[in-house]
Amino acid sequence: MTTTKRPIALLILDGWGYRENTHMNAIYHANTPVLDRLNAQYAHGLISGSGLDVGLPDGQMGNSEVGHINLGSGRIVYQELTRISKAIADHEFEQNPALCDAVDAAVKAGGAVHIMGLLSPGGVHSHEEHIEAMCRMAVARGATKVYLHAFLDGRDTPPRSAKGSLSHFDDLFTTLGHGRIASIIGRYFAMDRDNRWDRVSQAYELITQGKAKFQYDNAVTALEAAYERNENDEFVSSSAITDSEGKVASLNDGDALIFMNFRADRARQITRSFINADFDGFERAVTPKVNFVTLTEYAADIKAPIAYPSENLVNTLGEVLQNRGRTQLRISETEKYAHVTFFFNGGKEEPFNGEDRILINSPKVATYDLQPEMSSTELTDKLVAAIESAQYDVIICNYPNGDMVGHTGNFDAAVKACEAVDACIGRVVDALAKVGGECIITADHGNAEQMTDETTGQAHTAHTSELVPFVFVGRDATIDEGGKLSDVAPTILHLMGETIPAEMTGKPLIHVKE
């Protein structure tokens, strides 16, 4: 006999922070009658999703990967940014075996050391201080041909802010006496995660062959030309930078290629294009045999040396539910599917026993301000059906809209995105009420609550460090103040009457009144 479940749903509203300032605050200006009603009727508060509370440096804005790892693991997880920065400060980085082996092999073969990654101080996917440390280490170990392939940000940083970084690295290479910036391209192309291989192929051709839409003798000149074409950092077309003899850099057999992004989701596709023998995303004109190293683990099926392998997280929420014989569902759109699965499970790719997954394709549009509702209606259709099926104890769902549309910098579209999500929440809450279920509504980090940079006047496309909402739609309860994302998993187990494993250092935030 099938037991009917009374589920607890965790709705993660991606990029949905709380901000007192209402100026260009898309969440404040959106018409959200459902959330307004829930906040009036049910216990609610604010929790932290940034900085030290999620294992990032003090004051560092949160991000989706970090947020979901903390949400799912029930503990503060020391993030890769902090871990690698500490290794650099302690002079351990320059002795890292995977990095040293790749550089030494290239030097011995008379080859080049190619370093690629998001050249940004954003700290979300990478940090330019890590890239600088890698450049210094390569030269210190005898590399005379060091080529930096810079992916430009403008998403976790202001839209036109790359000039300072490029100038700094030009100066760095002059100081080191070796190396140069070999190419620049926007992250829109190099860091796609939605199988838009036509974008990734442009980055691949740029790095392997120096084949580009544009060619310049200086990276800053290339950037200024992109701005003249009305391309912000994120969207800069492939631009090869020539040396003093007018030659472009190319990737050749025996070279080292080191990928300096520490966040996995937007690093996977381009990595597979370099290392998978059976790769079929696009036609590769050349496939040089290189020593490829990833800074962190991007996926279990990516077979390359890893400078900083993942630390094993035991007894995450998913694992505890499996071990207690509970059922669970993970559901989101393409853009955040990895977050409710891989990241929520502490970096584990395979589903746990009793864990089902539903993937809804994100719309195929150039940027999500063109369709701010994204695929939220279809996502909610599937979610409501899953709730009504009464076969899951716990449901984890991510609505990407606030973050993905917030990143475009389009205020009006972000308002529409928030309104679309609010309508969907209404349907989910109604479905849960019919089966006696309960719901926690929260976010992984802020974004849509700040759509303009108060200092520069530019569009604000990055995440924020604001607190995020925490609403319990269920029994009469109180909510503790001062919570953080790592308190959410223990809270769910507490509501289910389950014991909380010792590995979870977070504390239950919700206390049901007797």
Swiss-Prot record:
Keyword terms, alphabetized: Glycolysis, Isomerase, Manganese, Metal-binding
UniProt protein name: 2,3-bisphosphoglycerate-independent phosphoglycerate mutase
Cofactors demanded by this protein: Mn(2+)
Enzyme Commission designation: 5.4.2.12
Function as written in the Swiss-Prot or TrEMBL entry: Catalyzes the interconversion of 2-phosphoglycerate and 3-phosphoglycerate.
InterPro entries the record matches: Alkaline_phosphatase_core_sf, BPG-indep_PGM_N, Metalloenzyme, PGAM_B_sf, Pgm_bpd_ind
GO biological process: glucose catabolic process; glycolytic process
Gene this protein is translated from: gpmI
Family: Belongs to the BPG-independent phosphoglycerate mutase family.
Residues involved in Mn(2+) 2 binding: 14, 64, 444-445
GO molecular function: manganese ion binding; phosphoglycerate mutase activity
Residues where substrate binds: 125, 155-156, 187, 193, 263-266, 336
Cofactor: binding details: Binds 2 manganese ions per subunit.
Cystine bridges: none
SUPFAM superfamilies: 2,3-Bisphosphoglycerate-independent phosphoglycerate mutase, substrate-binding domain, Alkaline phosphatase-like
Catalytic residues (UniProt): 64
Organism: Shewanella sp. (strain ANA-3)
GO cellular component terms, A-Z: cytosol
Residue sites binding Mn(2+) 1 per the record: 403, 407, 463
NCBIfam families: pgm_bpd_ind, PRK05434.1-5
Complex and partners: Monomer.
Catalyzed reactions: (2R)-2-phosphoglycerate = (2R)-3-phosphoglycerate
Pathway(s) annotated for this protein in UniProt: Carbohydrate degradation; glycolysis; pyruvate from D-glyceraldehyde 3-phosphate: step 3/5
